[in-house]
Amino acid sequence: MIVKSLDHLNKISEKILKKLDKKDCLFLVGEIGVGKTTLTRYLINNLQKQKGLSQTEVLSPTFNLLYEYEISDFKIMHYDLYRIKETKELKHLGIFSNELDAVKIVEWPDLIKTPLEDKLEIYLRYGEKEDERKIDFKGQGKWKNFKHEI
């Protein structure tokens, strides 16, 4: 699918949000600057708006590795694993520990090999025009057919 504007990307985030539940996992894959954090920002800000809360700034957690957002009954864990080089480093982050009743949004998920029940992989690529992006979806569990629902 070709995304022609930020408004279009925002509409896609709204469709993802309609299906999003606690414990879901979103993997964002793409080059630096392609829009992974922008999509995350839209998801978080739209959820805040939906819950009647003011919108917060959503930054890339490249240096912190993780930013957490408490949005009413939702907890969102936004990870950026760009600087992680070995799988053993992932264990220290505890991304998939069972006690985490949270949505996990993971940028640069390449090292994650844990099988997950409900996961949506979102692939972002630069389009032919400067402001275009190509986006594709690969889902597991309840996300399996999301590509056809959008």
Residue ranges and their predicted role:
Residues E31:
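P-loop (Walker A) phosphate-binding loop of NTP-binding proteins
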Residues I16-K23:
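Phosphate-binding P-loop
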Residues K36:
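Conserved lysine of the Walker
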Residues N45-E57, I71:
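Post-Walker A helix-loop "phosphate-sensing" segment adjacent to the P-loop in P-loop NTPases
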Residues L26-L28:
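Hydrophobic anchor at the beta1->P-loop junction of P-loop NTPases
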Residues M1-K15:
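N-terminal pre-Walker A segment at the start of P-loop NTPase domains
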Residues T62, L66-W108:
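Conserved nucleotide-sensing/catalytic segment adjacent to the nucleotide-binding pocket
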Residues K88-L90, F96-I150:
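Short phosphate-coordinating micro-motif centered on Lys-Gly-acidic
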